[in-house]
Structures are given as C-alpha cells and as structure tokens.
C-alpha cells in the first residue's frame, strides 16, 4: 500500500493558483511533481528562469535528434530499421517505405502503434483493408499479420508497447465522448480491394519475438478471411479527429492530451487549440521537473511555439532529473500574448522508466540543443 505524504502548505510569496497570477517579482513558475502530473506537486516562484544554465557537463542532458536523417530506415520490413529510443516497455523507431512490402509483418512482442508522419498507403491485415495517410495513428494488436502498399512514400513513427497492449485513457469528469468520440475510430473492411488480394501464391510472414526474427512460409496468402466478429481489431485515428480539452483560464498539463495508454507510458497528441486568454493565465507550457518520467516529443507539423529551431521530423528527449520548459523567446511571446492560437501537431511519449538512446539516434543528435535556452542562441 502506498500513500503519498501530502499536506498543502504555503511559504513566502506565492500565487493562489498553479499556472496563474504569478508574483510580479518572480514570474518564473516551476512545478516539481511526482507520478507524472497526477501525484503531489510543489510550485516554486523563481526570480530567474529555471532553464537559465550557463554550462552543462555530463551525460544527463536535454537532447534533440533529427529523425529525418537517421540512416538505415529505408527498408522493406519494419523489423529492418534500427531502434532509436527504448526501454523494456517501449520501442521507438522511424521507418521509410516507398515500395510494397514483399512479406507480411507480425509483432509477437507487443502492440504496434504506427503514426503516419508523411505519405499514404493501403494497409492489408487479418481484419481487412483500410487506407492510412498523413496524420493517422494505426494501432495494430499484437501478433496481427499486416503489410503496407504505399500510394505515396511513407515516413512512419513506430511505437511498440512491449509485452503489453494499448488502451484508451480514463476520461473521468469529461465523459467518454470528450477528446475524441470512440465512434470516430475506424476499422478495416473486408471489401473488394481486400478480396482482390486473395491468392494461392507463396507468402512469407516475418515474425518478431524477443527481438529476433523468424520467417513462416505459406503456400497461399494468409490474409484470406471472409469475415470476422469480436471486439479486437486494428483501429485508425487521425489527429484531426481530436478535439482537445482546453481552458481559457488555466494551462492544462500534457496529461490532458493523452491519446493512448501503454504499459509504463502514455502517448499524447498536441493539436491546434486556442491559447489561454485570461490575463493572469500562463500561455505557454510551464517549467517543470517531471521527476518520475522521461519525455519524448516527435514534431509532426506546424509552428512549435515553445521551441526554437525545431522542424517537422525532429525529436526532443528530456529525461527525468532536471527542469525543462519553454525557450526564452517563447516565454516572452506568452507574456505578451502575441499568439491567440497554436498550430502545432506533435506526438509525445512519456515513459515511467528511463529510456536508452541508440547509436543510430546519437548520430543525428544536435549536441548544442542543451544551450538552446540561452537567449543569445539563435
């Protein structure tokens, strides 16, 4: 049994409400919290930006990777591309595909979540056929047979929930239809296009189990179902179907934007929304120590209002153990309420256990990112 030691207390000069109405002499609020944004927290009011460091030594640091330039990601099989970020519960890769997959893929290690960063394709799987295109999540249950035939070249973010299954978040007070109605989730169809690919031709299935590949050969195409019933399926969700929670008086924590819940991590989606309009409300992400989680952000589209020099296809990685938050120009723009609407789209992965990054990721790292919070850095 675990019960936090909690006793709300005020000390010195502080605001009555988190993320709003800061003391004039200390406009930099820092949240130190436990269990993501669900545990006990303290809010400090600082005279200087908590990210105002002048030097940084050691391996623990904020990192940025340009996943547009990762080597070895152009492959005909998702199991041929390198791991980029990983722990025992989640595996993150990117994959570029321009030709039809010659074999079926099957992930026996866990559910696979594909986010289509670029392109369009026909997805064929045990459940039927559907088209996936830019902005789609395709959630593929563990051990499903599937393949892609690109209509346009694909750039895919892959997020494996190792030895576990994805679920939807509990929505609590706002109800089951908030953020997105489950009715917007699409499933594959046993349609004419699916039936047209029935064949007696030899077909291989590449199965990944314990990170190792086995190949099963059939004298026919195993995607030969004429129908199915049940409540397990591949599902598709586009970020444009997400209607974000918002408040004009309070900057909601990232957890309000949770899209899928994995074992040991969550996947959140940041989509365009109005910026807080109340004069006292914080209008950019707050400085925070998310001390129990590592944070990964994949930037998909738009103007990333809290970050400088970040483009689509890049990733920032903020491990637990230090404060992170908006860059100086973004913080100042928030104070001046320059923007009334965000137009960014990004995928966030918050992991309960520490992530490792691979050599393939390190090769595309911007080692100067740690100093991007310095006002002089362009």
From Swiss-Prot:
Molecular function GO labels: homogentisate 1,2-dioxygenase activity; metal ion binding
Cofactor(s) in the UniProt record: Fe cation
Any one GO BP annotation for this protein: tyrosine metabolic process
Key words, A-Z: Dioxygenase, Iron, Metal-binding, Oxidoreductase
Family, similarity comment: Belongs to the homogentisate dioxygenase family.
Protein name: Putative dioxygenase VC_1345
Taxonomic placement: Bacteria, Pseudomonadati, Pseudomonadota, Gammaproteobacteria, Vibrionales
EC number, as in UniProt: 1.13.-.-
Protein's organism: Vibrio cholerae serotype O1 (strain ATCC 39315 / El Tor Inaba N16961)
InterPro entries on file: HgmA_N, Homogentis_dOase, RmlC-like_jellyroll, RmlC_Cupin_sf
Positions that bind Fe cation: 288, 294, 324
């Amino acid at each position: 049994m675990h019960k936090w030691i909690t006793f709300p207390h005020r000390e010195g000069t502080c605001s009555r409400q988190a993320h709003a109405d800061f003391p004039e002499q200390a406009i930099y609020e820092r949240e130190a919290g436990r269990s993501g944004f669900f545990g006990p927290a303290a809010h400090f009011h600082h005279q200087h930006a908590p990210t105002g460091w002048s030097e940084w030594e050691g391996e623990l640091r904020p990192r940025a990777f340009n996943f547009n330039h990762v080597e070895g990601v152009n492959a005909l099989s998702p199991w041929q591309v390198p791991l980029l970020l990983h722990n025992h519960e989640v595996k993150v890769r990117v994959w570029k595909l321009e030709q039809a997959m010659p074999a079926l893929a099957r992930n026996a290690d866990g559910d696979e979540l594909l986010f289509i960063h670029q392109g369009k394709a026909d997805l064929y799987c045990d459940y039927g056929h559907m088209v996936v295109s830019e902005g789609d999540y395709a959630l593929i249950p563990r051990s499903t047979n599937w393949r892609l035939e690109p209509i346009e070249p694909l750039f895919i973010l892959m997020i494996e929930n190792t030895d576990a299954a994805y679920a939807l978040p509990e929505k609590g007070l706002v109800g089951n239809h908030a953020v997105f109605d489950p009715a917007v989730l699409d499933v594959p169809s046993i349609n004419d296009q699916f039936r047209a690919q029935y064949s007696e031709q030899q077909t291989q299935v590449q199965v990944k189990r314990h990170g190792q590949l086995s190949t099963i050969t059939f004298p026919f195409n195993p995607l030969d179902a004429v129908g199915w019933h049940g409540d397990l399926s591949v599902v598709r969700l586009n970020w444009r179907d997400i209607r974000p929670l918002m408040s004009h008086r309070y900057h909601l924590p990232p957890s309000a934007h949770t899209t899928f819940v994995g074992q040991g991590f969550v996947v959140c989606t940041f989509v365009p929304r109005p910026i807080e309009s109340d004069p006292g409300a914080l209008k950019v992400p707050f400085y925070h120590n998310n001390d129990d989680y590592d944070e990964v952000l994949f930037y998909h589209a738009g103007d990333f209002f809290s970050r400088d020099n970040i483009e689509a296809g890049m990733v920032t990685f903020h491990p637990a153990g230090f404060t992170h938050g908006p860059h100086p120009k973004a913080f100042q723009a928030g104070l001046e309420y320059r923007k009334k609407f965000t137009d960014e789209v990004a995928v966030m992965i918050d992991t309960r256990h520490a992530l490792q990054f691979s050599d393939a990721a390190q090769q595309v790292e911007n080692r100067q990112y740690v100093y991007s919070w310095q006002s002089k850095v362009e």
